[in-house]
């Protein structure tokens, strides 16, 4: 099913060359616009609310949250599918190769956090921000890589993408455990139940698209309601998607 949903990894990065440039241009425009005399319009747009749903089932989010919670969940889903393929049958399929980005990501989180703590030891109120330097912006990481095109070996792109994903997941876990004060445990249990159902369908060899799609939406909804960042739902869904260890899978 992975091959059905997404194209091969090399093809993914060929398309990313164009999108990386668009991402860079969009970031520059956003920086200039938000710091200009009409910057208030930029923030007004981000804070504009849009709703979808019927009757009592309505999802009302600002443009900012549609981007951060919905579109980024889809982004994490697609990228995690690609990395999952590499862990199963690609560049990261051997244990030693798979361990390298994991170690790199852990070091990339621990070292900046440690430096921050050392610098801010004497100021108690700023010490609470130790998790800030541990995060990586995965979208920009992949965007910068894509700008280099074929000049960067595909194995290096895979490694850095895996490292960025693991680093981002680590940051989400840190936020969930150390910064989330209002976790909704009912939603957390429903999120876990949805994920277990997806895993069960996978183990049964069930490969139809719509059950995964429908339960995936529920998984996102429960994750969003739990107080954990919604992007984790994209990662969990990608992990549960069936994969056949062959090019025809």
Which role fits each region the language model picked out?
Residues 94-103, 123-135, 152-162:
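The feature identifies polytopic integral membrane transport proteins across all domains of life
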Residues 6-10, 77-93, 142-153, 196-207, ...:
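C-terminal ends of transmembrane helices
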Residues 33-45, 58-67, 78-94, 110-131:
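Transmembrane alpha-helix boundary signature
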Residues 111-112, 133-159, 167-173:
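Short helical (or helix-break) motifs at transmembrane helix termini and adjacent helical loops
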Residues 65-76, 124-139, 180-193, 231-233:
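Structural signature of hydrophobic alpha-helical transmembrane segments
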Residues 22-34, 75-81, 111-113, 194-200, ...:
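Hydrophobic core segments of alpha-helical transmembrane domains in multi-pass membrane transport
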Residues 86-113, 184-193:
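Entry/N-cap segments of selected transmembrane alpha helices
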Residues 1-15, 35, 208-218, 222, ...:
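Predominantly late transmembrane helices and immediately cytosolic-facing juxtamembrane segments
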């Amino acid at each position: 099913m992975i091959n059905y949903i997404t194209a091969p990894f090399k093809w993914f990065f060929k398309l990313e060359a164009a999108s990386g440039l668009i991402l860079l241009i969009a970031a520059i425009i956003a920086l200039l616009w938000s710091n200009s005399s009409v910057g208030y319009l930029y923030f007004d747009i981000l804070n504009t609310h849009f709703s979808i749903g019927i009757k009592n089932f309505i999802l009302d989010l600002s443009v900012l949250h549609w981007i951060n919670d919905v579109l980024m969940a889809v982004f994490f889903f697609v990228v995690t599918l690609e990395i999952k393929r590499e862990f199963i049958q690609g560049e990261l399929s051997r244990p030693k190769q798979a361990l390298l980005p994991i170690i790199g990501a852990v070091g990339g989180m621990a070292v900046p956090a440690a430096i921050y703590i050392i610098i801010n030891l004497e100021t108690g109120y700023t010490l609470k921000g130790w998790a800030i330097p541990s995060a990586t912006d995965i979208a920009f990481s992949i965007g910068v890589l894509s700008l280099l095109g074929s000049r960067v070996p595909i194995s290096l792109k895979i490694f850095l993408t895996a490292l960025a994903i693991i680093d981002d997941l680590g940051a989400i876990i840190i936020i969930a455990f150390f910064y989330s004060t209002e976790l909704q445990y009912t939603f957390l249990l429903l999120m876990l139940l949805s994920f277990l159902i997806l895993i069960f369908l996978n183990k049964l060899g069930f490969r139809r698209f719509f059950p995964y799609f429908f339960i995936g939406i529920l998984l996102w909804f429960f994750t969003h309601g739990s107080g954990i960042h919604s992007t984790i739902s994209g990662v969990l869904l990608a992990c549960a998607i069936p994969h056949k260890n062959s090019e025809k899978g």
